[in-house]
From Swiss-Prot:
Gene behind the chain: pepA
Organism, as annotated: Picosynechococcus sp. (strain ATCC 27264 / PCC 7002 / PR-6) (Agmenellum quadruplicatum)
Cofactor dependency: Mn(2+)
Homology family: Belongs to the peptidase M17 family.
NCBIfam families: PRK00913.1-2, PRK00913.1-4, PRK00913.2-3, PRK00913.3-5
Function: Presumably involved in the processing and regular turnover of intracellular proteins. Catalyzes the removal of unsubstituted N-terminal amino acids from various peptides.
Taxonomic lineage from the root: Bacteria, Bacillati, Cyanobacteriota, Cyanophyceae, Oscillatoriophycideae
Name of the featured protein: Probable cytosol aminopeptidase
Catalytic activity: Release of an N-terminal amino acid, Xaa-|-Yaa-, in which Xaa is preferably Leu, but may be other amino acids including Pro although not Arg or Lys, and Yaa may be Pro. Amino acid amides and methyl esters are also readily hydrolyzed, but rates on arylamides are exceedingly low; Release of an N-terminal amino acid, preferentially leucine, but not glutamic or aspartic acids
Length: 491
């Protein structure tokens, strides 16, 4: 599917289908001035459809009408935009996704014109439509025996905004990164495991000319990564510590690290998860790694002047005679000792060594991403990501990037008093604290493994997965927060 901006008006456009946006009206809508010429060209059909369907432009309402065989346009889509005062780039993106869903199963539509109000600027409008169309179209059918035919739609023309190649390229790259992340998360643990995840990243590195260093188990032992290897001990599959690097041409403006939790399956270990959805969903526990490498794909395409290190300590958390037990003591690569009082709080153990490794690279900021705690979902629900940071400037930069991305974040406290709950009588700390404030104590645990570098922790346990098709998301992995990470790097 090709998306392009155009200076052409709706009145002059010709193709299979055209989508026209209308703001909500409490009274009967009339054809706006900018569409009267098109309505005349279509013999008044726009006004007729509005009257016959009592279309009032309510948000989420979409009317599709097939026109006569002699009409210059074959299908007319009237799209409700809701309250004009609430129109913004996020609403535009959602609107484009709704249009994509409305037309993707229609084999008669190969060309689509979009006449929608500008949101902020013409460039932002082009980017938002691009994101909405690509993500609204996306379905992951890789594992079905009968494949659906691809959508017939070949070209989308955004009318009245002029040529916007840079904005459309940005939106396209963001979507490709999101979709890569979604497919990693959606793949079950017999498809994506530490070995195949590393192979996928190796292919990514080869495609984009990125540097790649994969530390094998012996390398991790030599580096003293006892925390990571404690989690990996029970699995029959070898752990893979993945370090992917994007370097710009010339001197980089900045050097940062993105660290993603990479548990390709989490049984809970000896603190085994209960049967049912809790354990069945644990293929998604590498959502942080998926977002990390999805961001890498987009950044490699966009080529910013920032050096970025993408890191994930990838393993499974399984059960065997070799596995870590409740009460075991692990030693992380910074020398700190950890009493394991819950084998199902394993993600932070893998992140501990990954954060130590990242800081040794001499980066100016570290952001970790993890499906870390159910406590964060209890606090913020499944739409909002928890953000913790020891640096106000970094926290603000991520918040600003999230606004550009349209992904929801909420900054949470790093309450030092709560570290009391992590204290151990026999080690430097335990890996879990009391039930209360569980997402905060998890962040405080991670903070112990970053000494002097600005650091932020993103708990994506809620928004990493969607239970239904909604907005730009399809059921399954969401690719959250690839777009925020990319906007942060670009800024």
């Amino acid at each position: 599917m090709e998306i392009r901006g155009s200076s052409q008006t709706a009145a002059a456009w010709a193709g299979e289908a055209i989508a026209l946006g209308f703001f909500e009206s409490e009274t009967v809508l009339t054809v706006p001035e900018n569409l009267t010429a098109l309505d005349e060209r279509l013999s008044g059909v726009i006004a007729e459809v509005i009257a016959e369907t009592e279309f009032k432009g309510k948000s989420g309402k979409l009317s599709v009408t097939r026109l006569g065989s002699g009409a210059p346009i074959k299908k007319l889509l009237l799209v409700g935009l809701g309250n004009a005062e609430k129109w913004n780039s996020a609403v535009l993106r959602s609107t484009a996704a709704a249009i994509a869903r409305a037309v993707k199963g229609d084999k008669a539509i190969t060309t689509l014109g979009l006449q929608l109000p500008v949101a902020e600027t013409e460039a932002i409008t082009a980017q938002m439509v691009t994101e909405g169309m690509y993500l609204g179209f996306y379905e992951d059918n890789r594992f079905k025996s009968e494949q659906k035919d691809p959508p017939a739609l070949e070209a989308v023309e955004i009318l009245g905004i002029g040529d916007q190649p840079a904005a459309i390229a940005l939106g396209t790259s963001l979507c490709e990164g999101v979709i890569y992340a979604r497919e990693l998360v959606n793949a079950p643990a017999n498809i994506i495991n530490p070995v195949t995840l590393a192979a996928s990243v190796e292919s990514l590195a080869s495609t984009y000319g990125l540097e790649l260093n994969i530390l094998e188990e012996a390398d991790c032992e030599a580096a003293g990564m006892g925390s990571f290897l404690g989690v990996a001990a029970a699995s029959d599959l070898p752990p893979k510590f993945i370090h992917l690097v994007y370097k710009p041409l010339g001197t980089p403006r900045k050097k940062v690290a993105i660290v993603g939790k990479g548990l390709t399956f989490d049984s809970g270990g000896y603190n085994i998860k209960p049967s049912g959805p809790s354990i069945a969903m644990m293929k998604m526990d590498m959502g942080g790694a998926a977002a990390t490498f999805g961001a890498a794909k987009a950044i490699a395409e966009l080529k910013p002047d920032v050096e970025v290190h993408f890191i994930s300590a990838a393993t499974e958390n399984m059960i065997s005679g070799r596995g870590m037990r409740p009460g075991d003591i692990l030693t992380a690569s910074n020398g700190k000792t950890i009493e394991v009082n819950n084998t199902d709080a394993e993600g932070r153990l893998t992140l501990a060594d990954a954060l130590v490794y990242a800081e040794k690279l001499g980066v100016e900021a570290i952001v970790d991403i993890a499906t870390l705690t159910g406590a964060c979902v209890i606090a913020l629900g499944d739409d909002i990501c928890g953000l913790w940071s020891d640096n106000d400037d970094l926290a603000q930069a991520i918040a600003t990037a999230s606004e550009k991305a349209g992904e929801k974040f909420w900054q949470m406290p790093l309450e030092e008093k709560y570290f009391e709950g992590l204290k151990s009588p026999i080690a430097d700390m335990k890996n879990t604290g009391p039930r209360e404030g569980g997402s905060i104590t998890a962040a405080l645990f991670l903070k112990e493994f970053v000494e002097n570098t600005p650091w932020a922790h993103l708990d994506i346990a809620g928004p990493a997965w969607s239970e239904k098709d909604a907005d730009i998301y399809s059921k399954g992995g969401t690719g959250f927060p690839v777009r925020t990470l990319v906007h942060w790097v670009l800024s």
